Regions:
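Phosphate/NTP-binding elements of NTP-utilizing enzymes
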Residues: 45
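Residue-level signal for well-ordered alpha-helical positions
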Residues: 15-16, 48-51, 70, 89, ...
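Short, well-structured N-terminal submotif of metal-dependent ribonuclease cores
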Residues: 1-37, 51-66, 109, 118-119
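A short helix-to-beta-strand connector/capping loop
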Residues: 31, 71-73, 124
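Short loop/helix-cap segments at secondary-structure boundaries that form the rim of catalytic
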Residues: 119-126
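Active-site neighborhoods of divalent-metal-dependent phosphate/nucleic-acid chemistry enzymes
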Residues: 57-61, 70-116
Length: 129
């Protein structure tokens, strides 16, 4: 399984052409192994709608349910070990709790994270694609 960062998941569902071709290729290449989406990404999507930084033509709950029903998508639940790991990330990592939880999820599940987030890309203590 690979873990999709929130922005990758949203753009892939809304319009995959918003993603660079290299990211589209990574998703296609790893689909058969499973595409993980952290439950925190669901919270982030709802928060982005609340803050008017995203806009959907449907209720956010319906959008999330539809987006999670895509083939090969696996919802990755928050566990106590992920919660604790997010507070113990080695090295320097920025203070965004959602990013901390997503990185901790990738670390606990020992799977690569697909992201375009520069702050996460600069972090050397998580497997990246």
């Amino acid at each position: 399984m690979i873990l999709l960062d929130t922005h990758i998941w949203v753009k892939w569902v809304l319009d995959e052409k918003q993603l660079p071709e290299s990211v589209q290729r990574q998703i296609i290449e790893h689909e058969k192994d499973g595409l993980g989406v952290s439950v925190i990404s669901c919270w982030e999507v709802a928060k982005l709608l609340e803050l008017k930084r995203l806009n959907f033509d449907m209720d956010v709950s319906d959008w999330i349910n539809q987006a999670l029903s895509y083939p090969d998508i696996q919802l990755v639940e928050l566990s106590p070990s992920i919660a604790v790991e997010s507070t113990r990330l080695p090295g320097e990592f920025h203070r965004d709790p959602a990013d901390q939880l997503i990185v901790a999820t990738a670390r606990i599940h020992d799977c690569p994270l697909l992201t375009l987030d520069r702050k996460i890309l600069a972090y050397s203590h998580v497997k990246l694609l």
